[in-house]
């Protein structure tokens, strides 16, 4: 989820549910197909000549019976992992029975020419971020990343022109919730695990922050569209933020290649003690080396100048540090233990965004109090719902409707006016332009960086 600049403040910039697992071992269940005893039947005619024969038959019968009774007990079959459904709805806990989730792409740090040591303030900040070396924390974060990979894989394979954006968004939302095993319908459940922010489906010149909401006319995906798919997955407030772009016409291939290359350049450059300005320069150099021909006209791919990547904090998608896509003089450094969403946006337009009409979503201000005293009862009730279900995680009207809320817009406007809730608008470039986005979450660990959301797709 991109951070529009300038920032308001700061640096500019499992419970796992387990269900029954089928284990088709084949054959009939134990106890349903037992062999009979091998005992022979002895006749009543006590003929002396048959005595020896009867005696032999009895011995043989008993021997056969004893052999049959010495059956080997069947070994219990091991519990087999379930297979993912289509659409994805099987919780990850049923797919990874050992509870261990895949590690992301591990990259070594590039040599740091300056190699400056941490200041005392940086050391203090690092101590508050030592969780990046905690196995339990990492496993949960990797689980969230695996949820993202599985949901986006299905999206890339199944979404086609002719579908409405509302259907696509709800399929992604439902997939994330199902794989996490948290429906998010009870107070506090979506704070344990859920969506990191509203699923973004931004078309063409809409660069970022569009999601279908109730009351809007549904938009139908066209074969000529360029769609940015940006969604987040969190467990215990730690968000995996990753995005990709879908097209259905090869004419846009160079646009996508430019943005993907720029994102990878940013990931390669990022590291401990690296200046953000150096990451920005690498992104712009890669991005603007491309051009794209559309309708017989050639367009340079421009890095969008007033939206940025960002660091991620606990329950906070935009942590205060920004990573622009153009050269700048920012001497701020990335630090050990930080988490960054390295994303890039490229456009065939002006490369400059502005707020469009409408609302993408809302988010409780990070410095807002736990309780507010407002005259409007609906505002107080809505604020309680926000605290119980979202905290500081960004949400949208679609999520409020899902909880069964009605007639809440007046209360929401009151919360926005009093500065306790922020409102986010769609971000657009000039009409007729096309834009693309790719994004990954990277953990700056002590000995290496882990691109935790990396997959086979991008």
UniProtKB/Swiss-Prot annotation:
<dbReference type="InterPro" id="IPR002468">
    <property type="entry name" value="Pept_M24A_MAP2"/>
</dbReference>
<dbReference type="GO" id="GO:0004239">
    <property type="term" value="F:initiator methionyl aminopeptidase activity"/>
</dbReference>
<feature type="binding site">
    <location>
        <position position="230"/>
    </location>
    <ligand>
        <name>a divalent metal cation 1</name>
    </ligand>
</feature>
<keyword id="KW-0479">Metal-binding</keyword>
<feature type="region of interest" description="Disordered">
    <location>
        <begin position="1"/>
        <end position="93"/>
    </location>
</feature>
<comment type="function">
    <text>Cotranslationally removes the N-terminal methionine from nascent proteins. The N-terminal methionine is often cleaved when the second residue in the primary sequence is small and uncharged (Met-Ala-, Cys, Gly, Pro, Ser, Thr, or Val).</text>
</comment>
<feature type="binding site">
    <location>
        <position position="241"/>
    </location>
    <ligand>
        <name>a divalent metal cation 1</name>
    </ligand>
</feature>
<keyword id="KW-0645">Protease</keyword>
<dbReference type="InterPro" id="IPR018349">
    <property type="entry name" value="Pept_M24A_MAP2_BS"/>
</dbReference>
<dbReference type="Pfam" id="PF00557">
    <property type="entry name" value="Peptidase_M24"/>
</dbReference>
<dbReference type="InterPro" id="IPR036388">
    <property type="entry name" value="WH-like_DNA-bd_sf"/>
</dbReference>
<dbReference type="GO" id="GO:0008235">
    <property type="term" value="F:metalloexopeptidase activity"/>
</dbReference>
<keyword id="KW-0031">Aminopeptidase</keyword>
<dbReference type="GO" id="GO:0005737">
    <property type="term" value="C:cytoplasm"/>
</dbReference>
<dbReference type="GO" id="GO:0070006">
    <property type="term" value="F:metalloaminopeptidase activity"/>
</dbReference>
<feature type="binding site">
    <location>
        <position position="439"/>
    </location>
    <ligand>
        <name>a divalent metal cation 2</name>
    </ligand>
</feature>
<feature type="binding site">
    <location>
        <position position="209"/>
    </location>
    <ligand>
        <name>substrate</name>
    </ligand>
</feature>
<dbReference type="GO" id="GO:0006508">
    <property type="term" value="P:proteolysis"/>
</dbReference>
<feature type="binding site">
    <location>
        <position position="241"/>
    </location>
    <ligand>
        <name>a divalent metal cation 2</name>
    </ligand>
</feature>
<keyword id="KW-0378">Hydrolase</keyword>
<dbReference type="GO" id="GO:0046872">
    <property type="term" value="F:metal ion binding"/>
</dbReference>
<comment type="similarity">
    <text>Belongs to the peptidase M24A family. Methionine aminopeptidase eukaryotic type 2 subfamily.</text>
</comment>
<dbReference type="InterPro" id="IPR000994">
    <property type="entry name" value="Pept_M24"/>
</dbReference>
<feature type="binding site">
    <location>
        <position position="310"/>
    </location>
    <ligand>
        <name>a divalent metal cation 2</name>
    </ligand>
</feature>
<dbReference type="GO" id="GO:0004177">
    <property type="term" value="F:aminopeptidase activity"/>
</dbReference>
<feature type="compositionally biased region" description="Basic and acidic residues">
    <location>
        <begin position="1"/>
        <end position="14"/>
    </location>
</feature>
<dbReference type="InterPro" id="IPR036005">
    <property type="entry name" value="Creatinase/aminopeptidase-like"/>
</dbReference>
<protein>
    <recommendedName>
        <fullName>Methionine aminopeptidase 2-2</fullName>
        <ecNumber>3.4.11.18</ecNumber>
    </recommendedName>
</protein>
<dbReference type="InterPro" id="IPR050247">
    <property type="entry name" value="Met_Aminopeptidase_Type2"/>
</dbReference>
<feature type="compositionally biased region" description="Basic residues">
    <location>
        <begin position="67"/>
        <end position="82"/>
    </location>
</feature>
<keyword id="KW-0963">Cytoplasm</keyword>
<dbReference type="InterPro" id="IPR001714">
    <property type="entry name" value="Pept_M24_MAP"/>
</dbReference>
<feature type="binding site">
    <location>
        <position position="318"/>
    </location>
    <ligand>
        <name>substrate</name>
    </ligand>
</feature>
<dbReference type="InterPro" id="IPR036390">
    <property type="entry name" value="WH_DNA-bd_sf"/>
</dbReference>
<feature type="binding site">
    <location>
        <position position="343"/>
    </location>
    <ligand>
        <name>a divalent metal cation 2</name>
    </ligand>
</feature>
<feature type="binding site">
    <location>
        <position position="439"/>
    </location>
    <ligand>
        <name>a divalent metal cation 1</name>
    </ligand>
</feature>
């Amino acid at each position: 989820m991109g951070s529009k600049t300038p920032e308001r403040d700061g640096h500019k910039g499992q419970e796992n549910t387990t269900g029954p697992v089928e284990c088709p071992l084949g054959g009939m269940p134990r106890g349903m197909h037992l062999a009979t005893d091998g005992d022979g039947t002895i006749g009543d005619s006590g003929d002396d000549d048959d005595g020896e024969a009867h005696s032999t038959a009895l011995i043989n019968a008993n021997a056969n019976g004893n052999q049959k009774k010495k059956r080997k007990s069947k070994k219990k079959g091991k519990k087999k992992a379930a297979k993912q459904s289509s659409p994805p709805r099987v919780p990850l806990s049923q797919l990874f029975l050992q509870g261990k989730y895949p590690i992301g792409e591990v990259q070594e740090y590039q040599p740091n020419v300056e190699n400056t040591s941490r200041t005392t303030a940086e050391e203090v900040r690092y101590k508050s971020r030592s969780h990046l070396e905690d196995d339990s924390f990492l496993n949960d974060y990797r689980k969230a990343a695996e949820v993202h990979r599985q949901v986006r894989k299905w999206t890339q394979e199944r979404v086609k022109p002719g579908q409405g954006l509302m259907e696509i968004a709800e399929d992604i939302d439902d997939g994330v919730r199902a794989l996490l095993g948290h429906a998010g319908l009870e107070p506090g459940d979506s704070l344990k695990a859920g969506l990191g922010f509203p699923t973004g489906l931004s078309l063409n010149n809409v660069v970022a922050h569009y999601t279908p909401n109730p009351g809007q006319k549904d938009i139908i995906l066209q074969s000529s569209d360029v769609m940015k798919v940006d969604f987040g997955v969190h467990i215990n407030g730690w968000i995996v933020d990753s995005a990709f772009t879908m097209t259905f016409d090869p004419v846009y291939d160079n646009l996508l290649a430019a943005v993907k290359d720029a994102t990878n350049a940013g990931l390669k450059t990022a590291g401990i003690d690296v200046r953000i300005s150096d990451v920005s320069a690498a992104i712009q150099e890669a991005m603007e080396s491309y051009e794209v021909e559309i309708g017989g006209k050639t367009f340079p791919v421009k890095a969008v100048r007033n939206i940025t990547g960002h660091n991620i904090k606990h329950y906070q998608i935009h942590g205060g540090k920004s990573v622009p896509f153009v050269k700048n003089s920012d001497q701020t450094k990335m630090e050990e233990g930080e988490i960054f969403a390295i994303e890039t946006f490229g456009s065939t337009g002006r490369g400059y965004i502005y707020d469009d009409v409408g609302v993408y979503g809302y988010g409780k201000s990070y410095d807002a109090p736990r309780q507010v005293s407002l005259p409007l009862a609906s505002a107080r009730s809505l604020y309680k719902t926000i605290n119980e279900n979202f905290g500081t995680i960004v949400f949208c009207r679609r999520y409020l409707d899902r909880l069964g809320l009605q007639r809440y817009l007046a209360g929401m406007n009151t919360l926005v006016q009093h500065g306790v809730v922020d409102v986010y608008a769609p971000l657009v470039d000039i009409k007729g332009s096309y834009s693309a986005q790719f994004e990954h979450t990277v953990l700056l660990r002590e000995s290496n960086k882990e691109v935790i959301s990396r997959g086979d797709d991008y």
